[in-house]
Amino acid sequence: MRVSDFTFELPDELIARYPQEQRSGCRLLSLDGPTGARQHGVFTDIVDKLNPGDLLVFNNTRVIPARLFGRKASGGKVEVLVERVLDRTRVLAHVRASKAPKPGAGLLLGDNEDIRATMLARHDALFELGFDDPRDVLTILNAAGHMPLPPYIDRPDEEADRELYQTVYSSRPGAVAAPTAGLHFDQPLLDRLRDKGVEMAFVTLHVGAGTFQPVRVESIEDHVMHSEYAEVPQEVVDAVLACKARGNRVIAVGTTSVRSLESAAAANKQALIAPFFDDTQIFIYPGYHYQVIDALITNFHLPESTLIMLVSAFAGYRHTLDAYRDAVVQQYRFFSYGDAMYITRNPQAEQEQVVSA
């Protein structure tokens, strides 16, 4: 399969720069995986699509204000994007500068350039930085960092993004990108789902900046997925197994929940799923056999991205690309702050031949 098989034309004006005023007020395109039938509605329709006893699995990661601006102590502007917090004083980060800092180089960060950090080591594309500050890293970032909006939201971050670019249930700081399907759930909608008898469970996957990296190979089989840390605790495993046993469906909220659950299944050979606390590089594309999830709630993804490949593996390649082209015609809003899809699994998807239109 070629990366170019997963392209589609997207007018720039359909890229959402700001979210809807009301979280659950976005549009919802429902795609029936087996038939490819499509339905247009609003996100709160999700209540009618789920049954009592179904299980929604959310990602409870919380986005950290991971972007810092400043300069090298030797001169020259620098931009730091924290990829992973290692401990109270150290991080792994992407560093943009006219000349990459060498080990031992000092950085002066923050709007007032009063936060001191030292480049300790380089690990491929990432820099290990140590902060010389009495505060821990998360406190520093919360005080001085900027929200790391995706590159296609081509505007500076604003104070409002600190809450708007978070799910209402986020509780585990560590992500540099939001699990955006969850942005559409507000508390009244969650209450309605609970009142209906829909069950809920929470995994953690700290989304890294690699989620925005383009696929730089022609054949998708040659792509090496970025690594992200995921946790699927015992209570999630129990909830999934109980849901399956009673004949209900597991619905993943977002591709990060998909990757967490499927990683936990892939790592365990004795049962459907087992607890998982590890880095994952799972890459899901057409031909993949889904083991856990029955339905998926997700936003509209970038052309040629690993995420549209994941959706194609779930709903079927042709059904997915047809739905995306229809969404463009219907003027849906795309990407992180955009509209959503509800997709049921197409059991024939893994046998489908990918032939671009």
From Swiss-Prot:
GO terms for cellular component: cytoplasm. GO terms for biological process: queuosine biosynthetic process; tRNA wobble guanine modification. It catalyses: 7-aminomethyl-7-carbaguanosine(34) in tRNA + S-adenosyl-L-methionine = epoxyqueuosine(34) in tRNA + adenine + L-methionine + 2 H(+). It is found in: Cytoplasm. GO terms for molecular function: S-adenosylmethionine:tRNA ribosyltransferase-isomerase activity. Pfam families: Queuosine_synth (PF02547). It is an enzyme of class 2 (transferase). Monomer. Transfers and isomerizes the ribose moiety from AdoMet to the 7-aminomethyl group of 7-deazaguanine (preQ1-tRNA) to give epoxyqueuosine (oQ-tRNA). This is S-adenosylmethionine:tRNA ribosyltransferase-isomerase. The lineage of its organism: Bacteria, Pseudomonadati, Pseudomonadota, Gammaproteobacteria, Enterobacterales. The gene is queA.
